[in-house]
UniProtKB/Swiss-Prot annotation:
One of its GO terms (molecular function) is zinc ion binding. Component of a Polycomb group (PcG) multiprotein PRC1-like complex, a complex class required to maintain the transcriptionally repressive state of many genes, including Hox genes, throughout development. PcG PRC1 complex acts via chromatin remodeling and modification of histones; it mediates monoubiquitination of histone H2A 'Lys-119', rendering chromatin heritably changed in its expressibility. In the PRC1-like complex, regulates the E3 ubiquitin-protein ligase activity of RNF2/RING2. Residues 236-326 are annotated as: Disordered. Residues 265-278, 315-326 have a biased composition (Low complexity). It comes from Gallus gallus. This is Polycomb complex protein BMI-1. InterPro entries: RAWUL, Znf_RING, Znf_RING/FYVE/PHD, Znf_RING_CS. The gene is BMI1. Component of a PRC1-like complex. Keywords: Chromatin regulator, Cytoplasm, Metal-binding, Nucleus, Repressor, Transcription, Transcription regulation, Zinc, Zinc-finger. It is found in: Nucleus; Cytoplasm.
Length: 326
């Protein structure tokens, strides 16, 4: 699994800044011949005296270069979302300009041109913004009931939901720690924060979640959580060492027992559980949580025991093979 890397905005500046003014794009405009982008006012002023791209010297148009430039709304939205405070400052500058120059004709312009668009309307989220969210326990049975088109909600379902107001820069990891401390969940259990049915990564911020899942601000950001036992990974290195040590011991004594089929049977390691030994639940204080690991139950059935004991085992010692029926 590839590890996600986070980059600084300074590494993206060459793709977000205008080479004519040295600032971030405002009203980003792209030349259709070479796809280089600039601020609208910068490129319009430049093309009054030149008909070539200021970066690659491609001819924009022989006589009317303004015909081959297009407004790039997608690029401008990316710049506004990546640069903190840029959209708010630009809207303030436009409002101040039209307030100082009432004679300026802005009647034909949009609300954004006049600086009358708020961050909420543009869906721009800043790091210091407070986001309202709701979080509730992820219940698979509840999803099945919704699939059966049952619209009535019981009081228990309504009370399960909690509402929080958090900074947009707060990460999923902080939210998991908050849930663990509030609910006194032991470290033997894993907490997953989810959006609908998809688990969220620890480094996601609330702002990332709002952008990724296109939160429309028509209600609190809906999040869910689930609690499950922590999967314990087996240490393969220690098992290999144990197998190699047992193999060395068998090879030392194998020369005396090479002719005997019974003597060639490998000994079972004492650290591995017997298939006939019942395994108790590791979490008696949470009986409702299953102790199933890796898709297999902790208590094997009788059929599995009989097939395990009746299976023929074959081992090779010093080039000779021995088979036993168990």
């Amino acid at each position: 699994m590839h590890r996600t890397t986070r980059i600084k905005i300074t590494e993206l500046n060459p793709h977000l800044m205008c080479v004519l003014c040295g600032g971030y794009f405002i009203d980003a405009t792209t030349i259709i011949e070479c796809l280089h982008s600039f601020c609208k006012t910068c490129i319009v002023r430049y093309l009054e005296t030149s008909k070539y791209c200021p970066i690659c010297d491609v001819q924009v148009h022989k006589t009317r270069p303004l015909l081959n430039i297009r407004s790039d709304k997608t690029l401008q939205d990316i710049v506004y979302k990546l640069v903190p405070g840029l959209f708010k400052n630009e809207m303030k500058r436009r409002r101040d300009f039209y307030a100082a120059h009432p004679s300026a004709d802005a009647a034909n312009g949009s609300n954004e041109d006049r600086g009358e668009v708020a961050d909420e309307d543009k869906r721009i989220i800043t790091d210091d913004e407070i986001i309202s969210l709701s979080i509730e326990f992820f219940d698979q049975n509840r999803l099945e009931r919704k699939g059966n088109k049952e619209k009535e909600k019981s009081k228990e379902e309504v009370n399960d939901k909690r509402y929080l107001r958090c900074p947009a820069a707060m990460t999923v990891m902080h939210l998991r720690k908050f849930l663990r401390s509030k609910m006194d969940i032991p470290n033997t259990f894993q907490i997953d924060v989810m959006y609908e049915e998809e688990p969220l990564k620890d480094y996601y911020t609330l702002m990332d979640i709002a952008y990724i899942y296109t939160w429309r601000r028509n209600g609190p950001l809906p999040l869910k959580y689930r609690v499950r036992p922590t999967c314990k990974r087996m240490k393969i290195g220690h098992q290999r060492e144990g197998l190699s040590n047992s193999g060395e011991l068998e090879s030392d004594s194998g020369s005396d027992k090479a002719s005997s089929p019974a003597g060639g049977l490998p000994s079972t390691s004492s650290c591995l559980p017997s298939p006939s030994t019942p395994v108790q639940s590791p979490h008696p204080q949470f009986p409702h949580i299953s102790s199933t690991m890796n898709g297999t139950s902790s208590s094997p059935g009788s059929n599995h025991q009989s097939s395990f004991t009746n299976r023929a085992r074959k081992s090779s010692i010093n080039g000779s093979s021995a088979t036993s029926s168990g």
